[in-house]
Swiss-Prot record:
Keywords: Endoplasmic reticulum, Hydrolase, Membrane, Transmembrane, Transmembrane helix. It comes from Arabidopsis thaliana. Its main location: endoplasmic reticulum. This is Phosphoinositide phosphatase SAC6. It is a multi-pass membrane protein. Its EC number is 3.1.3.-.
Amino acid sequence: MVSRLKIHSGLRLWEFPDQYVIEPTDGSSASCLDISRLDGSMKLIDQVAECNSLRVPKIRSIFGVVGMLKLLAGSYLVVVTESESVGSFLGHPIYKINSLKFLPCDHSLENPHEEQKKMETDDYSRLLSVAERTTGLYFSYEINLTLTAQRLHDLGDESKLLPLWRQAEPRFLWNNYMLEVLIDNKLDQFLLPVIQGSFHSFQTAIGRDIVDITLIARRCSRRNGTRMWRRGADPDGYVANFVETEQIVRMNGYTSSFVQIRGSMPFMWEQIVDLTYKPKFEIVQPEEAARIAERHFLDLRKKYGSVLAVDLVNKHGGEGRLSERFAGAMQHITGDDVRYLHFDFHHICGHIHFERLAILYEQMEDFLEKNGYFLLNEKGEKMKEQLGIVRTNCIDCLDRTNVTQSMIGRKLLELQLKRIGVFGAEETIRSHQNFDECYKILWANHGDDISIQYSGTPALKGDFVRYGQRTIQGVLQDGWNALARYYLNNFADGTKQDAIDLVQGHYIVAVSRDMAPVPRKRGLEAVANFPVALTVILISFWFATMSVKQVGSGYKHLLFSLVWAGISVAVAALVRANGRIFCNRPSLHKPRS
């Protein structure tokens, strides 16, 4: 499974005034990579000594080259400046990125004719500062993290010898766009494939057996984004918050994995923030829903085989309209290899009775038993393969989805352990307290990671996944996280969405119609500022209150009170009527008003 051409696992970055030089320090005798700070051009050189400079260079250790991002006035070299080991995937070390750095190759900005580009790039630089704080990024120098254990096993011998980026599944390659320049320059040993998602593992003893459990998530980059600015599907059927979750168990030479997926309802719908707690759901081009859903499930069948779509949204209200549209679209798709199953999570389970998910499992048990899981014996021979996939969704594909997926994962892990011979016929994970506690924590951390990337906060209902029951502390934490989501969705996620679109190539600066990320605003949009509006409302209300207290001193105070109250009400009404304008909105891909 290991690529013949290994990626450099140790690097030293030399920062000269006119160039960056990346020197391998992993014991190989490979060439150094020279990157011009004037135009971002690249070439291989024999040694750092070839670089002449009158100034002492800045030297630092780095852990990989993520890619090169081209902007109007120059390019940015993207490198890993901090990382940590988080475990192993099929026996190969895995690392988490703790710090990214975008290094500018922008000396061309000193040209006075480039002043306009400099102003525009300053705006993009602010987005890159947001991108540097991207969470949940993982890499390996030795193995392809974008592929499941089953797909890795099924790779042909020739494919296994290819560089890791050539083996990679593009939809799960977070830095796919930024690697293009390095690929064009044939710099395979410097190309570091990165995924976004989650990676956690633990080891436990069951009797005399040592069992390793790993849970890895791979986020699709095709429609990546934030909770409120990336909903539903695009016209090609790619959905928001699409995450592939793989659970791997290794014991006594056996390796077994089970894969499931989550993703937004596969038709075009949105929920544009407008300062209300729950913005309205809007179905876009409803006549296209069936076609887009069909395209989505056709893609899933090609990649995973049979599909069971589990829809957890409410049957009534705004969610009900979406669920009805989803069910209607599925009528034209369902057959022997695609099933649709609706389970009103909130109606059946409420806020505390999550044990009722057993009802859902009974309805999907035949599908899971038929389509199974992947299993290798001690000799590395395939004994079973997974033939289908469970696709779970709620509105956000976070909280209800994670509770449900953890239940499915638990049931399948018990089947796997019985098949390997670790568990007896009636034995369950709950029969082993330490195993049970570690497994709950594994899935709780997994859900939090995915939720933070999409919504900005840990998952709701996480206490049930972590402890097996709802707790008062968990309910209070959910309330706090819900408020935090409201703030982030309304006042921060527009900028974060722009940063995602920029680094993943969804908005390409050089060819985009709008050359600056922030077009000129007109009318109310040009002056709309929520903090200022809120300040005016509060100050006006305070003056109105003070004037009311002095009404007895004369009618003048009554008039002042009415004026200040009127200002407060008028500004509040203006903000309420134009809530979308007062929110933090993406500028690169402008949403509908």
